[in-house]
């Protein structure tokens, strides 16, 4: 019996952010590919016709000099535990939040930059 796409999607949606990061790393090793390359190819696709973007992704590019403050800010923003937040900060660049409003994304970016992190909103 094989697993369906819906079952895989359901299993991944129940995972924590850190589990998904580990899954992606394992898949990159197993298949000899890079998820970053897939994102670059997808971004190079045809642009949407002047439609204003309503959902944004907040990407932690680098922790900066004050990693402890950044970990605290990540914990506050995501609700992750200490270990998960630390692992996420150390695995930068990493997506912190996806599909958030522009106001929420900008507020999160501001709080993380005040803690010393390098953040990008896409």
From Swiss-Prot:
<keyword id="KW-0687">Ribonucleoprotein</keyword>
<dbReference type="GO" id="GO:0006412">
    <property type="term" value="P:translation"/>
</dbReference>
<dbReference type="Pfam" id="PF00542">
    <property type="entry name" value="Ribosomal_L12"/>
</dbReference>
<comment type="function">
    <text>Forms part of the ribosomal stalk which helps the ribosome interact with GTP-bound translation factors. Is thus essential for accurate translation.</text>
</comment>
<dbReference type="GO" id="GO:0022625">
    <property type="term" value="C:cytosolic large ribosomal subunit"/>
</dbReference>
<protein>
    <recommendedName>
        <fullName>Large ribosomal subunit protein bL12</fullName>
    </recommendedName>
</protein>
<dbReference type="GO" id="GO:0003735">
    <property type="term" value="F:structural constituent of ribosome"/>
</dbReference>
<comment type="similarity">
    <text>Belongs to the bacterial ribosomal protein bL12 family.</text>
</comment>
<dbReference type="InterPro" id="IPR014719">
    <property type="entry name" value="Ribosomal_bL12_C/ClpS-like"/>
</dbReference>
<comment type="subunit">
    <text>Homodimer. Part of the ribosomal stalk of the 50S ribosomal subunit. Forms a multimeric L10(L12)X complex, where L10 forms an elongated spine to which 2 to 4 L12 dimers bind in a sequential fashion. Binds GTP-bound translation factors.</text>
</comment>
<dbReference type="InterPro" id="IPR036235">
    <property type="entry name" value="Ribosomal_bL12_oligo_N_sf"/>
</dbReference>
<dbReference type="InterPro" id="IPR000206">
    <property type="entry name" value="Ribosomal_bL12"/>
</dbReference>
<keyword id="KW-0689">Ribosomal protein</keyword>
<dbReference type="Pfam" id="PF16320">
    <property type="entry name" value="Ribosomal_L12_N"/>
</dbReference>
<dbReference type="InterPro" id="IPR008932">
    <property type="entry name" value="Ribosomal_bL12_oligo"/>
</dbReference>
<dbReference type="GO" id="GO:0003729">
    <property type="term" value="F:mRNA binding"/>
</dbReference>
<dbReference type="InterPro" id="IPR013823">
    <property type="entry name" value="Ribosomal_bL12_C"/>
</dbReference>
